[in-house]
Every structure is written in C-alpha cells, then in structure tokens.
Amino acid sequence: MPGTNLTREEARQRATLLTVDSYEIDLDLTGAQEGGTYRSVTTVRFDVAEGGGESFIDLVAPTVHEVTLNGDALDTAEVFQDSRIALPGLLPGRNILRVVADCAYTNTGEGLHRFVDPVDDQAYLYTQFEVPDARRVFASFEQPDLKATFQFTVKAPEGWTVISNSPTPEPKDNVWEFEPTPRISSYVTALIVGPYHSVHSVYEKDGQSVPLGIYCRPSLAEHLDADAIFEVTRQGFDWFQEKFDYAYPFKKYDQLFVPEFNAGAMENAGAVTIRDQYVFRSKVTDAAYEVRAATILHELAHMWFGDLVTMEWWNDLWLNESFATYAEAACQAAAPGSKWPHSWTTFANQMKTWAYRQDQLPSTHPIMADISDLDDVLVNFDGITYAKGASVLKQLVAYVGEEAFFKGVQAYFKRHAFGNTRLSDLLGALEETSGRDLKTWSKAWLETAGINVLRPEIETDADGVITSFAIRQEAPALPAGAKGEPTLRPHRIAIGAYDLDGAGKLVRGDRVELDVDGELTAVPQLVGKARPAVLLLNDDDLSYAKVRLDEQSLAVVTEHLGDFTESLPRALCWASAWDMTRDAELATRDYLALVLSGIGKESDIGVVQSLHRQVKLAIDQYAAPTAREALLTRWTEATLAHLRAAEAGSDHQLAWARAFAATARTPEQLDLLDALLDGTQTIEGLAVDTELRWAFVQRLAAVGRFGGSEIAAEYERDKTAAGERHAATARAARPTEAAKAEAWESVVESDKLPNAVQEAVIAGFVQTDQRELLAAYTERYFEALKDVWASRSHEMAQQIAVGLYPAVQVSQDTLDRTDAWLASAEPNAALRRLVSESRSGIERALRAQAADAAAAE
C-alpha cells in the first residue's frame, strides 16, 4: 500500500511527545447526494513535551488547502505527502493546528462510505474508521493511545439525519453542532448521515436513563423488528452492568443498520454500526437471530472493553475482540430471559471451528501477536484474534473461577476508565482477585502459537472396570513457515461419562473436572468405576484443544451421535469428526456417512446449517476426485429427502431447502427448483420468498439453466440493493466464458464496483463445479495480484486476493505456481500471508483427497 503505513515505533515516539486534548471537526456534506469530495476543517489542540520537537498528523485526502500551526501558515506542498502532514517546530506546551482539506466519499466501506439506495435514489453515508481510516475524514493522530475529546459540526441536506457519538442536537439551518465526546480513540468516533428511518426507546433501571435508537434505510423499515433488537439490547445492559459493576459510560446508545458494511458491526462509542443484512427481508432460521443477537451483545460489551478502556497499541487488539466475543456468549448463556441459553453450543460449533482452522495455517501466531505496523493489524482480524482468544478467555475463567474473573474485570474498569492499557494491566487485576500467578499461564497460552491434541488412554479389566485412565497431551509441529515451537499447555478440562439409557439416549452419568499439564496426566478419579459407553474429553468445552475419542467411544458415537440429550456434547463430537476429516484422519466418504446417520436427530439448527456447509466443502475439496460426483449425488438426494420430510414451516425445512439448492444437479432436481420458483410445484410450509428465490436463481444460473434474461426478470421483482447484489452473483455464476470474462474484468481490470457488489461478483465467479472453465484464470490471478494490491484500498484488495485465489484447482500444479509467485513477486508481508494461507488450503485438500482415495481401496 503506497505511503499509508504507520509503525509501532513511530506511534510510540509520537505518544511520548504529544498529549492530545481536543478535536473540533467541521464537515460540509451538503453535496453528498452527488458524491465526489467534501470540505473537512479540523482544529486540534495538543500539548508537546518539554523541549518541543517535530511530529506529524495523519490525513488521506485528495487536496489539502490550508495547514496552520500556532497561527503560522505552512506550505501544503512541503508538509503534506501520502497520508501525513509534517508538523515541524512544535512548541513545548499547548499547540493549535488547523487543517482545511477536501476529503473523498468512498465506496469501499472505509472512511466515509457513500451508498445510493436504488429504491429511493437517496444517498446514505456512514463512517468506518477501524483501523486507520478516521484520517480519511479529518486530520487525526491515528493511534489508539492518543485519546481526546471530539466535537463534530456537520452541515447536511435538509431533511436528513445526522448521528454521532454524542446525543443528536436540533439542527440550525441544516447544521448539527454536537457536544464534545468523552476522551476516546479516533477509531471509535463516527458519523452516520442521511434520510434514515429511526425507532426510539429508553433503557431505564434504578434511576438510570439511557436513550436508545435503531436506524435503517426507509426501504428496509417494514422489515425492521425493533422490539426484538431492543429486547436483546436491554438484556445486555442489565447483564453487563451487573457483571462489570460500572454504569454504561456514554450518554446514549444508537444502533445503525447500514448498507455495504464490510464487517459484522463496529463498536463506535454510543453509535454502533451494523451490517443491514441483519434486518431480515425474508424468513431466516433461529440461528440467524442468535447470530444477530450475539453481534448486538458483542458491540455493547465493547462500550466498556475497547471504548471506555482501550488498548495502547494494536498488539492487544486480540484482548478487545476476544473479550467481546467471550462476553456475547456468556451473556446469551446466563442473562435472565435470554432466548439462546445454549450459546456455548454455538460457540463450540462456530467460533471454535474458526479458531482451529486459523491455528493450523502457516500464518498462525500467538494470541498476543507482534503487530509492528498497520499492515500487520489489517490482516490480523482473524480466527486467533477473535475465536481462539475468546476460547482461551473461557479457559481462563475456568482456571481462576468466574467470580474472581469478574471481580478482576471490575477493578480493571474502575482503574483505567477512559484510559489505555496493556495486557499486564488486566492480568494484574485478575491475579489480585484470584490469588493465582498468571505469568506462566500467559506465557503458555498467549505468547505461543499452535493447538494441542488431547487423547484418552484407558485400560479396563475383564468386567469392564477402569483400571487405568490418563490423558495424553500432544503438541503437533507448527505448520511449515509458522514461527515458534510446539508447546504443551496447562488445561482445565472436564471429562464426561455417558451411557445409553432405556430410550437409547446418551446421558451423562458422571463428570470429573481436573487440571491437565504436561505430556501425561493420570485421572485417578475414574479408576475403579465401570467403563461408560462414551468418555468425552473437554466436556463442557472449557479448554481449547483438539479432542480425540478412544476406539470404543468412537464406535458408540458413530452410531449414536444424534442421541446425546444435550446439544453441547453433540457439537463437540461433530467438531471432532470434522477436524479429523480436515486432518485426513477420517475419509470424506466416512464423514458423509456419519453426518447422514446423525443429522436427522440434530435439533440445534445452527449445528445443522454448519454441517450442511462442511459436507459441501468436504465433498468439493476433500473427496477423491473420482468419487466426488457419487458423493454429491448421495448428499443431494439426502437433502431433498430431508426437505420433504421436515416439519412444514420449520427452520429445518428452510435449511434443507437451501442445502438442496446449493448442490441440485440432475434434470429432475433442477426442474423442481424451477417449478418452486414459478409456483407450479409447492412443498407444504415452504415459503419461496425473496431470499430463497435468489438462492434458486443463482443455482439455476450456475448450471446454465438461467441466463441473463431470467436473472434480469428476477431483479425486476427485487429492485433493491440486495437484489442488485444477488443478480451480480447470478450473472457471474453462469458457466460460460463470456460470463467469467465479464465478471473478471469488472473486479480485476476495473475499480468501479462498490465493496459489496465486488464481493457478490467474486462469490458468483468461483463455482466448485466449474473447475475446467476457471482453470485459465489461475495464471491471470498471479499476473494481476501485485498491481491489485498496490492500487486498491486494503479491503478491496483483500477481497480479490483471497476470493479469486484458485482454491478450486486442487493440484500440485497450483501449489507449484503459488510457490513460484511467492518466490519471485516479493509481496509485502500482508499479501504474502493471505496467499500463503490460501496455498495451505490446497495442501490440506490434497492430503484429504489421498486419505479418501485410500479408504476406497
């Protein structure tokens, strides 16, 4: 990326020299409907350490008109370059800087994003500043430890709404003058501007009153279930304020559902932005509502952990995200009135799976990553930073005890409110409340990479009584290219003993909790007891480790996986089977057989939908190529059978309809999709609504049944932003050279597409059953990649680098071509990481394909 980086050392030096007091930011957005640029005027007051010196402030702008430092005009041609304005001759004590610039609206989801809704032709704006993009809107010292107050003044078109971190004032002559914020970091400031629809309420408890707002575009207003969102929000307020013993720290709490958002949501202080796909236009399963609720709670937790108390530098990003990820699940599991008390099942099913995958890539890194610059942090929003970190926090809670954990957190908030911290500050507070020395624990869990494997070693006598039980811990070699050494870690785990009852259900009859440390840990608590049908290590999912079953337990689970009475042990066994498949320990054909034998009894809809995705991935990537079509046929026939057998109108019925649409292939199956679309056939209870229609259309386009005219006709039914994206996916999915060339040109050779449409085109372009058609693009990908990375914003370049990598071409040739590019292209560290991660997927797929082929012999 050209000239826009910032190193940790530069940030450290700047923080040593400067203390920032306040920003006054004046933006003229009256031309937002037309786009282009807008006037940005920033006044910053800051103090300089004794002796004075020189520094710089960050700004990304097409034009800088004025830079005035302490009343002296600086030559903009001399001081402004790339993303920095040099500040020479700083005086000890108070300095005042004024910068006048023209900043640009974006369509990449970075900085001030501008979107025009095709329904009403109105522009909608919102900011996204994490990590370094406040500098795209106003001149800022773009690092988290230079906190300040921020006072925004915004001029906007008449009839629009302007939302920021502070309560929204009454406009005067279409000018909104907000009161200053508390001291916060620049990356959690925000502006959301446009003719948004809103619903308002108040959170009230024990004399506290916090205004609540929910916003979306008017074209989504009919779908906005504000009452449900407010309900989850209030539960979060109740639970977090009790657990944290610290009142919500801002004056109001708005949640704004915004278009073309790159992430799930963003924790702007008091003004959380959330992707508007969470305003559901069509029927979704309860799993989607659970994920939305988790997102709401995640961002609310950040108001304390991240906004009130903020990391000093981005190497502690993991603590921000891990804590919020842990807190969302803990709140859903324990908050009174929660609709998702099984949230730890979802955590095991989704977050842990993400973490285990990320931790086995060549880019694996310690949870506490070494973040040397902005390029490092931009690719570090990964499964280790979020999911492994949250898993390890769950382990820490088990290790120190829940009461001690939250007492430590309470002390941490009180001690560091509106300040910046390091990991040692939190660990110190937890050591005080728990009495445990956490230095050794931290070194093993936070400062090393990789994942352990836990295996049971069991001996029984002739009567089936356990005579010896131990847990063997392994530390597999780290992936090639990863830094560090394999590490054995201390684990606090539970062991569950399960037997079949008279109804054929697997019921837990005993539970042992213990510390596992070193290579072999004896478990005397189980010696002398009758051997149960299943012994499950890491029951209750307290620790972070791969778990393997002993031979007898595996045999019982293979036959009775769906018979566990509780969802969490089922999820743990499903996860173990999937992990074994990815590790080439279980053949894809055997994994499919296991899923087909147990999925019909799986009640957790989130687990069912994960199994759908995993089976498709396994067949597409991990099956022996000669067996792939037969396995796809078997799976698709099963999806149709389950669709027809599912309870009418149920979540399971909808999930099976989507799974069927994803792989429908025979003329009869495709005829059924077509007939469900035009209404000549129906399945009782199945509403073929807008989103399901698009799933059917996209599949019919991908197999060549539908062309441009059918896609255009469907778009006429749904002339919305979502419809535009779905149509783009369908057009790119068509199995023709012309369709692929058009899609490729629009993404790689042009930079005109907005972020969400580019993502949609990439999703359609890559079809796993179009390998031959896509083969020619392997070489074109490598030829274009460096130029794309150099010329696009980070978000847009990453979409292309990851999304268009030839992952469907599972072959040694793809590995060789990737290696040749890595050796010759000299990519920077961030791009090298992304390509190396994709390469790792090819290696894993080749191993799994070999294992599947061997199982057929």
UniProtKB/Swiss-Prot annotation:
InterPro entries to which the protein is assigned, alphabetical: Aminopeptidase_N-like_N, Aminopeptidase_N-like_N_sf, ERAP1-like_C_dom, Pept_M1_aminopeptidase, Peptidase_M1, Peptidase_M1_aminopeptidases, Peptidase_M1_dom, Peptidase_M4/M1_CTD_sf
GO BP term, pick one: proteolysis
Coiled coil (residue ranges): none
GO-annotated molecular function: alanyl aminopeptidase activity; metalloaminopeptidase activity; peptide binding; zinc ion binding
Cellular localization per UniProt: Cytoplasm
Cofactor(s) needed by this chain: Zn(2+)
Binding, Zn(2+): 298, 302, 321
Enzyme class: hydrolase
Annotated PROSITE patterns: ZINC_PROTEASE
Chief site of localization: cytoplasm
Subunit structure as annotated in this protein's UniProt entry: Monomer.
Annotated protein name in UniProt: Aminopeptidase N
